[in-house]
């Protein structure tokens, strides 16, 4: 089949996700052509998706790696970008939320999330109402944040072409740590909170700015699948105990 052959060729240099998106458009066109009598059969459903499964980029750093990175960042406090990385690791805030920080959004040992800067839009509104929140900081992190001189546009951090993940990759490589993206720092913060039995899921949901608890629960199961397996085992043990 010619269409399948073309899809196979395309998939050699594209991810499975991208190939699937292209194939869906082709199927829609073929279905339209069939519906208007331009094709004898609607063979689009027979065409299969190929392509490479992309490696997950937003991986969480291990607790050990998190400690190494945090200790380095607390020492290397002259670089504005590294302070931003420390803030992301410390708060779990999204990149856009940190770029949206202004001096008036900083309180003693805390920051207020009120805006979000995006590379694709001039709209600085937050994703949801729950995204509007107050995040506590350790005093040493707060002092480093206060050392940054605000920019002429009123914000604390320079978007710097939105290349934070690239710069982070180079920093992690230099420190010999696993490579992740800026969003991976948010995942790392969340994983650290999830690992503590003393911190409630409600608090974590509020700190991450999730729209509801279910979003946080789904996030939890994605980040820590081994916990789900353990809970499955605990649930079965509990049910078995009822018959003893």
Predicted features along the sequence, with ranges:
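N-terminal core-binding DNA-recognition domain of tyrosine site-specific recombinases/integrases
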Residues: 1-38, 55, 76-77, 158-163, ...
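Flexible coil/turn residues that form the inter-helical turn or adjacent wing/linker of helix-turn-helix
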Residues: 12, 80, 91, 178, ...
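Basic, Lys/Arg- and aromatic-enriched nucleic-acid-binding interface segment
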Residues: 16, 20-22, 35-41, 45-95, ...
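C-terminal catalytic core of tyrosine-transesterase DNA break-rejoin enzymes
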Residues: 17, 35, 86, 90, ...
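DNA/chromatin major-groove-contacting recognition/catalytic segments
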Residues: 69-72, 123-125, 218, 222-244
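Conserved tyrosine-mediated DNA breakage-rejoining catalytic core shared by Y-recombinases
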Residues: 100-144
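Active-site/catalytic core of tyrosine-dependent DNA strand-transfer enzymes
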Residues: 138-178
């Amino acid at each position: 089949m010619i269409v399948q052959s073309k899809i196979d060729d395309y998939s050699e240099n594209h991810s499975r996700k991208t190939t699937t998106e292209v194939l869906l458009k082709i199927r829609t066109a073929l279905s339209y052509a069939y519906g208007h009598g331009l094709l004898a059969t609607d063979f689009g459903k027979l065409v299969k998706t190929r392509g490479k499964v992309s490696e997950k980029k937003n991986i969480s750093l291990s607790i050990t790696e998190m400690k190494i990175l945090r200790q380095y960042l607390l020492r290397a406090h002259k670089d504005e970008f590294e302070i931003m990385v420390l803030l992301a690791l410390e708060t779990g805030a999204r990149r856009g939320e940190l770029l949206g920080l202004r001096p008036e959004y900083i309180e003693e040992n805390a920051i207020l999330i009120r805006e979000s800067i995006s590379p694709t839009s001039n709209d600085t509104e937050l994703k949801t109402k729950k995204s509007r929140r107050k995040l506590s900081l350790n005093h040493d992190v707060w002092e480093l944040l206060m050392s940054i001189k605000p920019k002429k546009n009123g914000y604390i951090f320079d978007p710097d072409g939105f290349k934070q993940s690239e710069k982070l990759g180079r920093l992690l490589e230099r420190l010999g740590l696993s490579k992740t993206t800026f969003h991976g720092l948010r995942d790392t913060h969340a994983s650290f909170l999830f690992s503590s039995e003393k911190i409630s899921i409600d608090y974590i949901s509020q700190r991450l700015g999730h729209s509801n608890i279910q979003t946080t629960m789904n996030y939890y199961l994605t980040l820590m699948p081994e916990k789900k397996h353990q809970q499955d085992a605990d649930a079965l043990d509990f049910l078995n105990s009822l018959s003893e």
